[in-house]
Structures are given as structure tokens and as C-alpha cells.
Design a protein with these regions (language model features):
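Conserved hydrophobic beta-strands of the Rossmann-like cofactor-binding core
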Residues: 18-19, 67
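Residue(s) in the substrate-gating loop at a strand-loop-helix junction
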Residues: 72
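Active-site helix of classical SDR
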Residues: 52, 88
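A short helix-coil junction within the Rossmann-fold of NAD(P)-dependent oxidoreductases
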Residues: 11-12, 28-29, 54-63
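Conserved amphipathic alpha-helix within the SDR
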Residues: 1-13
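SDR active-site lid
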Residues: 101, 105-172
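Conserved mid-core segment of classical short-chain dehydrogenase/reductases
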Residues: 2, 24-38, 81-84
């Protein structure tokens, strides 16, 4: 990332806006391999850190700049059936908050993008790709409020950046979910358990797949 940033700055000049967008999803819980959890940590968290390290010094020297970091609604609400995705996207949101707090006075502005399902190749490219599974191909748990197009997400992002708005929620329902979670965590957890039961009505629940690690 550092070399890429240096090349772009050399060829085109200072970077005003850096969009940090990479990710993949897996379906596993505590039984997932350490190596897979670590890989997701590298992609969903450390990649944002590497990017910030690469672009912030020059942005600050130039009087400011903008980071658009893609996280996920899972970072605010959790992802049923995927431990690694849930915890790394939560960390990505926290990282964006930290950068905004720490570097705001230096002219750095941050937005964190937290969509649900978007029509991309993230599921097709997943190491757990279940091609032929209708539920998987329809977007899985994240598609409960519909799948939106990348162009729609881009429009929402441009509007948010023009307003210097931190939290970008292309699926408007997520705002209500996060408010309900903050107001009543116990009811929210109960509702998520019931949602999980509905999702896996004819198959084992994710927790039933955990092996004995002792």
C-alpha cells in the first residue's frame, strides 16, 4: 500500500480522498482455523491501518484529507454465522472512530461505510462459496433488507462526504437497529437469537457446529 500511494502521488500529485475497500466473508464460529481468522483481521483491520499510515502524513502536511473506510452493518450489529466477519468489521468501525477523534484537528475527515448486502462478488469470492445454494446466492443473512446496487452506494457516499458525515448507512433500516441495540441490548440479543432460529430452521445452528477444543 505504501508503494502504491507513493507511485500515485509521484504521477498524479497529492491524494485528497483515499477509499479503503477490501473484504471477504466466511461462515464459521469458534471452530474456524486461526489462520483464517488472522487473514480476515489483516484484510478488514490492518489494511485500513496500513492505508492510514501511508496517506495521513502527506495529507496532514497539505492541511487535510479524507478517508472513506468500508466496514459493514455487521460491525454495528454482528453477523450471524460468521465470528471473524463480525469481530473484524466491529474493529474497523472502532478504528475509523479513533482516527476521526485523533486526527480531526489536523484536517483529517473520516467516513465509515456500513452497508448490508450490496450486489458485488464478495460471496462468489468467499472461500466458503456455496454455489447453488439459493440462500447463499440471494445474499445470505445480510440481504434481509434487500440487496442494493454499487452505484446507489456510491451516490450515498458522495453525499455523506460532501457533508463530512462520519457514519454512512446505505440501508436506512440499520439506523433503527443500532438505536434499538443501544437502548435495550437484552431485547436486541433476544431478537437476534430468534432471527438466527428462523435462518437455520431446517439445519443445525452455528453454535452446534463447534468442536471440543480441550
Amino acid at each position: 500500500i505504501r508503494n502504491m500511494v507513493a507511485t500515485i502521488e509521484h504521477k498524479h500529485g497529492p491524494i485528497d480522498l483515499f477509499c479503503s475497500n477490501a473484504g471477504f466473508v466466511t461462515s464459521a464460529g469458534l471452530e474456524d482455523a486461526n489462520e483464517r481468522i488472522q487473514k480476515m483481521w489483516e484484510v478488514h483491520v490492518m489494511a485500513h491501518i496500513y492505508a492510514a499510515r501511508a496517506v495521513l502524513p502527506q495529507m496532514i502536511a497539505n492541511g487535510g484529507g479524507y478517508l472513506l473506510n468500508t466496514a459493514s452493518a455487521a460491525g454495528l450489529l454482528t453477523q450471524i454465522g460468521s465470528l471473524s466477519y463480525s469481530i473484524t468489521k466491529s474493529a474497523a468501525v472502532s478504528l475509523a472512530e479513533w482516527i476521526s477523534i485523533t486526527h480531526y484537528h489536523q484536517g483529517i475527515r473520516v467516513s465509515v461505510l456500513c452497508p448490508q448486502a450490496v450486489r458485488t462478488d464478495i460471496l462468489t469470492n468467499s472461500p466458503d462459496n456455496r454455489e447453488g445454494d439459493p440462500e447463499w446466492e440471494d445474499g445470505g443473512v445480510a440481504s434481509s433488507d434487500g440487496i442494493i446496487e454499487p452505484t446507489d452506494v456510491a451516490e450515498v457516499c458522495m453525499e455523506a462526504i460532501s457533508e463530512e458525515r462520519f457514519m454512512i448507512l446505505p440501508h436506512r433500516q440499520v439506523q433503527g437497529y443500532t438505536e434499538f441495540k443501544a437502548e435495550n441490548p437484552e431485547k436486541w440479543l433476544s431478537g437476534m437469537r430468534k432471527f438466527q432460529d428462523r435462518l437455520f430452521i431446517d439445519e443445525p445452528l452455528p453454535g452446534d457446529l463447534m468442536q471440543d477444543f480441550r
